[in-house]
Design a protein with these regions (language model features):
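Single conserved hydrophobic/aromatic residue that forms the stacking wall/gate
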Residues: 213-225
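Conserved phosphate/anionic-ligand binding catalytic regions in large, soluble enzymes, centered on
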Residues: 54
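Short glycine- and acidic-rich boundary segments immediately preceding or forming the N-terminal edge
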Residues: 1-30
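Short beta-strand-to-loop junctions in surface cap/lid or active-site-entrance loops
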Residues: 35-43
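The conserved beta1-alpha1 loop
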Residues: 51
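Active-site/substrate-binding loop(s) of hydrolase catalytic cores
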Residues: 44, 58-207
Length: 225
């Protein structure tokens, strides 16, 4: 069996059997996101887990934080990248789904533009600097402060047949009552990742911008695992 190699992404390099908790620079330092990177001792796939694509969806964000806190490197095959909140500035300003500077929703802008507005440039950075490194993608969401919803999971539905099939298989592992096949290929982060050949899902759990430890976060952690 081939030995696990150091995992390199941007300016970061993580050795097998080690975990990194800190910041990842994107677009040559124009954006900085809080991440945890777990590089297992054994080779395997690279899984990307993101939260805070919409910064007011706190259940997904806390689930990513808790997963990074409790994940044991000894149990990891391959590499797991956890981005705890992509829209860091919007999270800090309680801006919800919309960009502070341009009023745009990141989850409507993929694949983004290299020379676009701030949100478009962030989408472009994620699509070109994160997605090429990963084999599977899980995006954690929840209902914003104006959204009531029943827990469900989207899986990518506009991609190559094998990508759609694997996305559905991933979705079937999530403990929610409903599963929805997406009908778009761009705009959303997971939709665009699938168009690049990456099986992807989006989990929705929690509502109204509320985080209650009596309900959703632990189940999201389990679903991500």
């Amino acid at each position: 069996m081939e030995a696990q190699k150091n995992f390199k992404i941007g300016t970061l390099e993580v050795k097998p059997g080690e975990a990194y908790h800190g910041k990842l620079e994107l677009s040559k330092g124009a954006f900085e996101v809080p991440v945890s990177v777990f590089c297992g001792k054994r080779p395997g796939q690279t899984v990307l887990i993101t939260a805070g694509v919409q910064a007011g969806e706190y259940v997904g964000i806390q689930s990513a934080i808790d997963l990074a806190r409790h994940l044991q490197i000894e149990k990891v095959n391959g590499t797991i990248i956890i981005v705890k909140v992509i829209r860091k500035e919007e999270f800090e300003h309680r801006a919800g789904s919309l960009g502070v500077k341009d009023g745009k929703n990141l989850n409507r802008e993929f694949p983004g533009k290299a020379d676009g507005t701030e949100t478009e440039r962030l989408a472009y950075a994620v699509a070109t600097e994160l997605f090429p490194y990963v084999d599977r993608y899980i995006d954690l969401h929840s209902g914003n402060d104006y959204e009531r919803l029943t827990p469900f999971v989207y899986y990518a539905g506009c991609a190559k047949e094998e990508v759609v099939a694997m996305s559905r298989k991933m979705a079937e592992q999530v403990d929610v009552p409903y599963m929805v096949r997406s009908a778009v290929a761009t705009g959303g982060a997971y939709n665009y990742a699938a168009s690049m050949g990456i099986p992807s899902i989006l989990i929705e759990r929690g509502e109204m911008g509320c985080l209650l430890y009596t309900s959703p976060s632990p189940r999201d952690i389990s679903g991500s695992r």
